[in-house]
């Protein structure tokens, strides 16, 4: 009897040691279709169509904490993509970190979402597969939402206000360059407001080179003094959801050929949704105003509409149906794209 009790006690020790470790994730897959029509000088010059079974952002992660005493905790997370299409490789390719949390707030180091990326849920409430992200998601404003190898501090909430600062060293950022990030949040009785800013010495991009009869896209430091400012506000009472967002980005082209010319664009977006029992219909609209490229006016305007609905089978399983329309440019030279998707999701 004593041996049985000892064996039972020893078997329980690993469970107790892992009591603060949580396994979580989501499996998302579905079917998507897309069509893109390019117009040049008023005539159709290119048409692309397709349909496929795709992954819509599946992931798996582990997170935990340890009580260090005196109100201090060690916190950690290891998260990675887990595509049902078998396209993800490696550990920690999503937000992963280790840090300390206490009355002073939270400080973390690792691969961390920026404040811009944190506001993304209130700018883009949609999901897409590999080839439909530019149409089924509010992708124009999301271009500067990244994850950085960095250190980040998040303050405690005080009277509805909270803030964050983040720093990514240049030696960790590759083509992204040294960057500074700041965020400010406010929430009260369902109302919320967010500001996120990015300040970057060199901006990211790609350039194409030809070698051995092949064309390659490589990272290119082609913009400098990049600034992105985003304001988001809205209301959410778990039934009615409304949000509006505005973003302005400004940079200079880098290099002798460009003469450090000025580049900028302003974008806006809005989303509304209302929950009827298990069904939540939603609609989003986004617009990119005419900006400047190479210090000259440039018709990089766009208009986008996404509509759809979610159906909750349970707290963990849901389905999403969505359709999107995107037009880049106007008049005789434009690209008109449409896409649709039916997605099944399960969270654990």
UniProtKB/Swiss-Prot annotation:
Compartments, as annotated in UniProt: Cell outer membrane
The keyword Phosphoprotein belongs to this UniProt entry's keyword annotation: no
Membrane protein topology class: Multi-pass membrane protein
InterPro entries membership: Gram-neg_bact_OMP, Gram_neg_porin_domain, Porin_dom_sf, Porin_Gram-ve, Porin_Gram-ve_CS, Porin_Neis
Disulfide bond annotation, renumbered to this chain: none
Molecular function via GO: porin activity
Pfam families assigned: Porin_1
Signal peptide: 1-19
One of the protein's GO biological processes: monoatomic ion transmembrane transport
Record's GO cellular component terms: cell outer membrane; pore complex
Domain of life per record: Bacteria
Keywords: Cell outer membrane, Ion transport, Membrane, Porin, Signal, Transmembrane, Transmembrane beta strand, Transport
UniProt family annotation: Belongs to the Gram-negative porin family.
Function: Serves as a slightly cation selective porin. Major antigen on the gonococcal cell surface and it may have pathogenic properties in addition to its porin activity.
Assembly, per entry: Homotrimer.
Protein name stated in the entry: Major outer membrane protein P.IB
Source organism of this protein record: Neisseria gonorrhoeae
């Amino acid at each position: 009897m004593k041996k049985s009790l000892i064996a039972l006690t020893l078997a329980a020790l690993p469970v107790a040691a892992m009591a603060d470790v949580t396994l979580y994730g989501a499996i998302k897959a579905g079917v998507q279709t897309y069509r893109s029509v390019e117009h040049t000088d008023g005539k159709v010059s290119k048409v692309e169509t397709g349909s496929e079974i795709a992954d819509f952002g599946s992931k798996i992660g582990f997170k935990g904490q340890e009580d260090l005493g005196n109100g201090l905790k060690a916190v950690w997370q290891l998260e990675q993509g887990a595509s049902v299409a078998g396209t993800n490789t490696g550990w920690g390719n999503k937000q992963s970190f280790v840090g300390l949390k206490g009355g002073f707030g939270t400080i973390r180091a690792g691969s961390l979402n920026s404040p811009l990326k944190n506001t993304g849920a209130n700018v883009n409430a949609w999901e897409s597969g590999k080839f439909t992200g530019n149409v089924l998601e509010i992708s124009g404003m999301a271009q500067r939402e990244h994850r950085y190898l960095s250190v980040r501090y998040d303050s405690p909430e005080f009277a509805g206000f909270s803030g964050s600062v983040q720093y990514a060293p240049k030696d960790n950022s590759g083509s992204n360059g040294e960057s500074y990030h700041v965020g400010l949040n406010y929430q009260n009785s369902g109302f919320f407001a967010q500001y996120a800013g990015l300040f970057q010495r060199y901006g990211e991009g790609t350039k194409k080179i030809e070698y051995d009869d092949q064309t390659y896209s490589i990272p290119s430091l082609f913009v400098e003094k990049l600034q992105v400012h985003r304001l988001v506000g809205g209301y959410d009472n778990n039934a009615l959801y409304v949000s509006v967002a505005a973003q302005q980005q400004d940079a200079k082209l880098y290099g002798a050929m460009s003469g450090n010319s000025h580049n900028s664009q302003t974008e806006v977006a809005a989303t509304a949704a209302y929950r009827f029992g298990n069904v939540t219909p939603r609609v989003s609209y986004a617009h990119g105003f005419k900006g400047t490229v190479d210090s000259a006016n440039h018709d990089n305007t766009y208009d986008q509409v996404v509509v759809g609905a979610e159906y909750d089978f349970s707290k963990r399983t849901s389905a999403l149906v969505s359709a999107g329309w995107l037009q880049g440019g106007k008049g005789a030279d434009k690209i008109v794209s449409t896409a649709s998707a039916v997605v099944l999701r399960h969270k654990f």
